[in-house]
Curated annotation (Swiss-Prot):
This is Probable protein adenylyltransferase y4lH. InterPro entries: Fido, Fido-like_dom_sf. The keyword ATP-binding applies. Keywords: ATP-binding, Nucleotide-binding, Nucleotidyltransferase, Plasmid, Transferase. The keyword Heme does not apply. It comes from the Bacteria. Belongs to the fic family. It catalyses: L-tyrosyl-[protein] + ATP = O-(5'-adenylyl)-L-tyrosyl-[protein] + diphosphate; L-threonyl-[protein] + ATP = 3-O-(5'-adenylyl)-L-threonyl-[protein] + diphosphate. Probable adenylyltransferase that mediates the addition of adenosine 5'-monophosphate (AMP) to specific residues of target proteins. It holds the Pfam family Fic. ATP binds at K82, G83, G139, N140, G141. Residues 52-190 form the Fido domain.
Length: 192
């Protein structure tokens, strides 16, 4: 099953939609298992320090996916999307990500929100934007969730990932792609 629409992806094994990987696993299901195993292993380690900027975001991606992909932490080089929604074209990723993270910094990384509801609303804006940019070929969702956890702590709250309902969260992310942030804000609020 094809998970993403992609244009001429040199990162895949020829004739497949399976990303080339350090373990040389040509089967998507096996790669998914290996990727999650490596992610979980790296999650037990200290996270990279940073300033909650795009360089820090890329360092987080590199940390979690370095054992799986040579390009971990590097921005996407091909056009890709899901369903009928295309993500930011690769030639604009750096500019758009830097714009987004500058705006996040101007908002003090959401640390000065007056309530959990206000934080959830701001976090939903950020997640919708970074998801539309989709800077990496794979691993965007997990990197987003790690970064959301960091933002939540920076704002003085805790994110309870045990309350994450994947289907509801994914549906909310999809709706956010067309500008409807309310379901995503509600999902974030439910977890803090």
């Amino acid at each position: 099953m094809v998970r993403y629409n992609a244009v001429e992806d040199p990162l895949c094994y020829p004739g497949t939609h399976v990303l080339r990987n350090r373990a040389n696993i040509p089967d998507q299901n096996e790669l998914d298992e290996f990727e999650q195993l490596m992610f979980d292993s790296r999650a037990r380690e200290a996270l990279p320090d940073g300033d909650l900027d795009f360089a820090h975001y890329r360092a987080l991606h590199r940390h979690f996916f370095q054992d799986v992909y040579e390009w971990a932490g590097q921005t996407r080089i091909i056009r890709t999307g899901k369903g009928e929604n295309w993500f930011c074209y690769p030639e604009y990723i750096e500019r758009e990500a830097n714009r987004l993270f500058a705006e996040l910094a101007a908002r003090d990384h959401l640390a000065r929100t007056e309530s959990k509801e206000a934080f959830a609303k701001g976090a939903s804006w950020f997640l919708a934007e970074i998801n539309a940019i989709h800077p990496f070929r794979e691993g965007n969702g997990r990197t987003q969730l790690v970064f959301l956890t960091m933002l939540t702590r920076y704002a003085g709250y805790e994110l309870d990932e045990s309350k994450l309902e994947p289907k509801r969260f994914l549906d909310a992310m999809i709706r956010s792609f067309s500008g409807d942030l309310a379901p995503l804000a509600a999902e974030i609020r439910r977890m803090i």
